[in-house]
Amino acid sequence: MKKVYAAMGTDILHHGHINIIGTARRFGDITIGLMTDKALANYKRLPLLSYEQRKKIIENVKGVVKVVPQDTLDYTANLRKIKPDYVVHGTDWRTGDQKEIRAKVIELLKEWGGKIIEPEYTKDVSATMLINQLNSIGTTPELRLSKLRKLIELKPIVRILEVHNGLTGRIVETAKVNEDGSMREFDGMWVSSLTDSTSRGKPDIELVDLTSRLHTIDQIFDAT
């Protein structure tokens, strides 16, 4: 039986993932390279479910023979170990952040005659989009604190930038750098009364009244 490899990092399984697995199943036995918690935290976002929980879900999908950890966005270690006949991925990685990863996979597969299978990317759905929709419902201080603890646990560096108006909030929210196939972005924002005071031309002794502080926070919420 031919060997098929597909990488996934999801904790919300949707029909796009099922399409990928369904395509892969036609070519042989599927091994899923499931991104670890640390890999996901450094690439996309904090996972909602732990690696073991996500692994249990994927293992029970029809056609999946094995689930192995993928510690980075780079496929190299797992592909050299498994030497699959096929790697399956949606067409979305032909452009954007994963373009370089795709090129590297193609070169690697040439070493043993492997091929890439690229089913059409399922549009209008993604795990990130679904999670953002859930987050839009609201959050609590307890949830934010739990998320911060998990960030500190999983990431070697947690990137927090000070914000003091809507523009700086937008910078934190949208600034991204693609470095060696890995996305770098800010994890959160911090509102400093000291900087808020200085940005208003006042002494750097946090001399800003509560109404002004709330107005600043309202500006940030409105822009982000």
Where are these regions (language model features)?
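Active-site beta-loop-alpha junctions enriched in small/polar residues
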Residues: 9, 35-37, 121, 162-169, ...
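Nucleotidyltransferase catalytic core that binds NTPs
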Residues: 1-143
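Generic structural signal for well-ordered alpha-helices
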Residues: 21, 55, 145, 166-169, ...
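Surface-exposed amphipathic alpha-helices with a cationic face
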Residues: 19-31, 110, 149-152, 173, ...
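Hydrophobic faces of well-ordered beta-strands that scaffold small-molecule active sites
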Residues: 32, 159-165, 187-191, 224
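Alpha-helix-loop-beta-strand connector modules within alpha/beta enzyme cores
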Residues: 203-224
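N-terminal amphipathic alpha-helix/helix-capping segment at the start of soluble metabolic enzymes
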Residues: 130, 138-177
